[in-house]
Amino acid sequence: MAKQTINQGTAPTGAGGDTFRTGSAKLQANDNELYTHLGAEADGVLTVEKTRTKLGVISDKSELTILIKDSLRQSVELASGGLQTVLYTAKGQATYMNIIQKYDMSTIDASLSGTHPAFIVDGVEKPEIFIGTYQGRIVGGELLSLPNVEPTHSTNYTNFLTAARACGNGHHLITNAEWSAVALQCFKDNKQPMGNTYYGRSSENPLLIGRRADGLNPGDTSGSARTLTGSGPVEWRHNGKENGIADLSGNVWEWNSGMRIFNGEIQVIADNNASKLAIDLGAASTEWKAINGETGNLVTPDGSGTTAGTIKYADGGTADYTINGSNFGGIRNLSTTKPVTAAALARLKALCLYPHIENTASYNGDYFAKTMTDERLPIRGGSWYNAAAAGVFALYLSNARSSTPASIGARPAFVNL
């Protein structure tokens, strides 16, 4: 086999070049060819004898053993058909990830256009993002995506954010943009997942169960009914298959980064910039931007949640550029004089802050609620007791960043920065 060369594209962005996965496949093919030629065993171990060898190595009385393959990563990628992989943190710990490829919003809704914002960081498009296959568990100060563990809970947003960033550059707490990118794909594929929404089982189908961390039986309403990550059936995966992302619906709510409301005003971090290691996501950060209800452009907020002309949630009424609803699919444009324009709604739809189809039933009654005072951060997905209100589009905007409920966890993600 001839040596495979990676197409690096056009500098400085790499436009037109190979994706991360394609480039990795070429490197792996080159490695496989080389080590086969050198006589590597099937397990990928190359033993160099005591004399000068084809590698040009002269060893002493011992043998030189070179471990050439990451068997865990290879096994995960092989079993998942390349949709999952294993990344390693700053401390060398494994974290399991699903690879989500870049897509255009027109593939979700023909009336929308442009690359989904989850795939844009500092104005540069990314070919893929990596989403934790499992809800996160903090181990050694790092937020990891691991199978068959109880997800960490009862921890505030800041602690989860710190643990996610401790994994190294590119590792982060899942952003609202990333969550939305996955949720919209679920919708497009007609695969809105079920999950642990009734004390260890699905509220929609009691035969779909997971293994409760407290050891009690599914459906027993006593105890804290968190299930072990990924222990449910394929119906609890985002694509309905074993290689999907687990537990996006139910089990524990998940903190999302990069979005908030402040006194009801919707504010976001541009695109997927919330994935950056050093970006300021604090309450007083100047990175927070409001959304102009006429143009959809990001604008600097006034600091009190009353910025003129920006989109705000409301508890009712018909004030300019306000939206509200009793569940996610029921959120509607309220104003009769200055409704949010189509251009501005397009931004909200991409971020799953407004239904991209105004049809309540299309979103299975997924939950929506908010608190209209002070800063409130989003949690998504629902918990083990939310029943039919839990789901991939469920959005709850009532928690302060200091909140520590037992029903809230988090999920790690990664972008190659």
What are these regions (language model features)?
Residues S180, N205-L208, A213-G215, T221-A225, ...:
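C-terminal, surface-exposed recognition/capping segments
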Residues F187-Q192, R260, I269-N272:
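Short secondary-structure boundary/capping segments
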Residues M1-E63:
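Fibrous stalk/shaft segments of extracellular and virion attachment machinery
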Residues S62-A79:
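Structured alpha-helical subdomains that flank or immediately precede key functional sites
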Residues G114-D247, I279, T341:
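Short aromatic-cysteine micro-motif
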Residues A11, N32-E33, K61, Q135-I138, ...:
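Acidic glycine-/aspartate-rich tracts in secreted/extracellular proteins
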Residues G16-S24, G140-T155, G391-S398:
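Short, polar loop/linker segments at the starts of domains and inter-domain junctions
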Residues Q74-H171, G264-T322, R376, G409:
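Extracellular adhesion/carbohydrate-recognition regions
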